[in-house]
Amino acid sequence: MPHRRCHQRAAYAQVWHRAVGWYWGGVDFQLTLRVDGEARSLTVDTRTTLLDALRDRLSVTSPKKGCDHGQCGACTVLLDGRRVLSCLTLAVAHDGAEVTTAGGLASADGELHPLQRAFLDHDGFQCGYCTPGQICSAAGMLAEAAAGHPSAVTAAADDGPGGGGPDGRVVLSDDEIRERMSGNLCRCGAYVNIVAAIREVSAK
């Protein structure tokens, strides 16, 4: 019996040391991310966020660190086509994933993405700090609307402002755009121009 208890204590101690090691020191993990069309391999601590992996390890500085708490949206990127807050996303959970930043939305020959062009045409930024996150969020939001995903303000009617169109797409009224972009803050207050830029692209 004492021998058995000794083994149990040893097992508990091993689990404890692993847990403490993870909490205080983390564990290194090798992963590959396809960032803006380019495969990038790196070794990171398991606690490293996708934002820190991109900025600090891969020198991809398009996504910005604003609040670092998932409240401002400046860090938004597209992860396998879906918009995510990279400051709340663990890099190790997405080994092999496709990551697209605002810088990667332009074509290989340098032609701007329609959203990038629209933000320029409508002065959808002032200081520009939130702009990469705004553009990535808008790109993800347009894809969600095209797939028919409703928002909190989507009308129950089959058509009309904010409602669904005949092909199942969500008609993006200004209210829809504001609701769907509400997770991205602009401290300069360029919201009117941001909505105008997205409205132009959504109408095409």
Where is each model-derived feature located?
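Ala/Thr-enriched low-complexity intrinsically disordered regions
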Residues: 10-13, 19
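Signature of N-terminal electron-transfer/Fe-S-associated modules in redox systems
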Residues: 17, 21-204
